[in-house]
């Protein structure tokens, strides 16, 4: 993405955002309040809107970096492995809080029910943004989403805009 407008930057895209381990149960139908259902299948996947954005950007050929917060736990190790395997520069911060999780039930009609446990994602504060100012200033685009604190998104975008980077926020 080297162009006169963006000059020579280290990254095409920096994503600041969430990373979760998705725990997915396949069920015949979604549970009603108070009902217990038996799953016919189970899988774990890397997830979180931020991590998903970073993977998509990297797979599209962009030089991609990820800034987020992970726990010092097995889920954090799995997600760091995904970042490495996908060729994404990992600037994730370790926390003493468990890595975020999403508990997902998917029924036979592909309808789902999701409970998100933010965990470490909610510890992505202004301090993390400040610690990564040089990364946020050395990219053409900064992507974010609202699975991390809003004040951190605003601070990251302020840094990026000073460096004349494009900013984009996925609100849903």
Across the structure, where does each feature detected by a protein language model lie?
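Glycine-rich phosphate/adenosyl-contacting loop at the front of the ribokinase-like
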Residues: 1-69, 76-81
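Ribokinase/PfkB-type carbohydrate-kinase core domain
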Residues: 2-19, 77-94, 104-172
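Beta-strand->loop->alpha-helix junctions that form or flank phosphate-binding loops
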Residues: 16, 40-44, 67-72, 87-100, ...
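Short active-site-adjacent helix-start/loop capping segments
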Residues: 23-25, 74-77, 99-101, 113
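Glycine-centered flexibility motif
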Residues: 34, 50, 71, 100, ...
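Short glycine/serine/threonine-rich phosphate/pyrophosphate-binding segments
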Residues: 49-52, 75, 98-100, 151-153
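A broadly tuned preference for mixed-charge, low-complexity surface segments
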Residues: 63-72, 149, 153-157
């Amino acid at each position: 993405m080297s162009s006169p407008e963006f000059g020579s930057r280290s990254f095409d895209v920096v994503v600041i955002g969430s990373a979760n381990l998705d725990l997915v149960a396949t069920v015949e139908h979604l549970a009603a309040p108070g009902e217990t259902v038996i799953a016919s299948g189970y899988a774990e996947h890397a997830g979180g809107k931020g991590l998903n954005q970073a993977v998509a950007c990297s797979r599209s050929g962009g030089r991609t970096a990820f800034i987020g917060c992970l726990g010092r736990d097995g889920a954090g190790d799995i997600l760091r492995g995904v970042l490495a395997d996908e060729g994404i520069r990992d600037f994730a911060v370790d926390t003493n809080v468990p890595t975020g999780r999403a508990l997902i039930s998917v029924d036979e009609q592909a309808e789902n029910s999701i409970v998100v446990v933010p965990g470490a994602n909610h510890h992505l504060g202004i301090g993390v943004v400040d610690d990564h100012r040089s990364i946020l200033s050395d990219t053409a685009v900064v992507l974010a989403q609202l699975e991390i604190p809003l004040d951190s998104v605003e601070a990251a975008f302020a840094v990026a805009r000073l460096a004349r980077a494009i900013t984009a926020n996925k609100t849903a």
